[in-house]
Swiss-Prot record:
Its main location: cytoplasm. PANTHER family: RIBOSOME MATURATION FACTOR RIMP. It comes from Exiguobacterium sibiricum (strain DSM 17290 / CCUG 55495 / CIP 109462 / JCM 13490 / 255-15). This is Ribosome maturation factor RimP. It is found in: Cytoplasm. The gene is rimP. The keyword Lyase does not apply.
């Protein structure tokens, strides 16, 4: 369904940007018997319900004219929340100095899950400061090994 999400991104991005917001993510997923088109938006200071309703209405209108999806589905426009996904270079760059959660395809230093402060990011490598018991360690993770990355809330 990557083709669907790419087409929806192309349709949604100008709509979202015209309203002064950022398109964070588009997912098309099946849950039980139902399909959901989830669109995450954000802006400085965060989005509110009115922002989500506004984008939902405008995107729904655009999808009614040029819908790349054949199946019936529910459109859900929302904030990415506190644990925002990190997918694009800009996402990682904005997250430098913040607490993140990283899951890798293959083990790095004998682990596939990491949580810590993002210190640096480049197209090839990122560096995390993680806490192991009472010590802080720096770990380099190749970007091509990242399966999933998101901001993490610290309690």
């Amino acid at each position: 369904m990557t083709n669907v999400t790419e087409k929806v991104e192309q349709l949604a991005k100008p709509i979202v940007e015209r309203e002064g917001m950022e398109l964070v993510d588009v997912e098309f997923v099946k849950e039980g018997a139902d399909w959901f088109l989830r669109v995450s938006i954000d802006k400085d200071g965060g989005v509110d319900l009115e922002d989500c309703v506004n984008i939902n209405e405008k995107l729904s209108e655009a999808l009614n004219q040029d819908d790349p999806i054949d199946e019936p589905y529910y459109l859900d426009v929302a904030s990415p929340g506190a644990e925002r996904p990190l997918k694009k270079t800009e996402d990682f760059e904005k997250a430098i100095g913040k607490h993140v959660y990283i899951k890798t395809h293959d083990p790095v230093k004998d682990a596939t899950e990491f949580e810590g402060t993002l210190l640096t990011y480049s197209e090839e490598m990122l560096e995390l400061e993680v806490r192991v018991k009472t010590r802080k360690l720096k770990i380099e993770i190749p970007v091509n090994k990242i399966a999933m990355a998101r901001l993490a809330v610290v309690f």
